[in-house]
């Protein structure tokens, strides 16, 4: 597991979180309490912040990356599940969403509370 600072900003990962091996988290990343991050997840907060709420599950092989410019962060609410291999880029997921396996959520997209995004959706 690699939890690394980037440009003076260090990830915040509470002790209540479960972070598996082969996970890379770097930059301005803040995880809420009781999150689970499964193997081969990459969180890259190089340009803006990534903020993840409590009780969120990020499954195997996901990429979470910020966009350049104002408003390009990634905000993930509480109780969210992000399925295997999904890509989240500069977007907002509100509370209790389910993002299907392999889905891609692009810059500026907002997924409202309790929404389901189908596997493979773009």
Each predicted region: which residue ranges?
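Phosphate/pyrophosphate-binding betaalpha-module
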Residues: 49
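Left-handed beta-helix
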Residues: 15, 20-21, 26-27, 32-33, ...
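Terminal amphipathic alpha-helical/low-complexity segments used for targeting or macromolecular assembly
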Residues: 1-16
């Amino acid at each position: 597991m690699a939890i690394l600072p980037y440009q003076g900003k260090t990830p915040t990962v509470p002790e209540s979180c479960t972070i598996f091996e082969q996970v890379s988290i770097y930059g301005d990343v803040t995880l809420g309490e009781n999150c689970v991050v499964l193997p081969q997840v990459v969180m890259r907060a190089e340009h803006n912040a990534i903020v993840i709420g409590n009780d969120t599950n990020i499954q195997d092989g996901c990429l979470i990356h910020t966009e350049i410019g104002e408003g390009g962060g990634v905000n993930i609410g509480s109780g969210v599940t992000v399925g295997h291999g999904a890509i989240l880029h500069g977007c907002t997921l509100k509370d209790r969403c389910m993002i299907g396996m392999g889905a891609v959520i692009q810059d500026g997209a907002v997924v409202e509370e309790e929404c389901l995004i189908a596997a493979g959706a773009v």
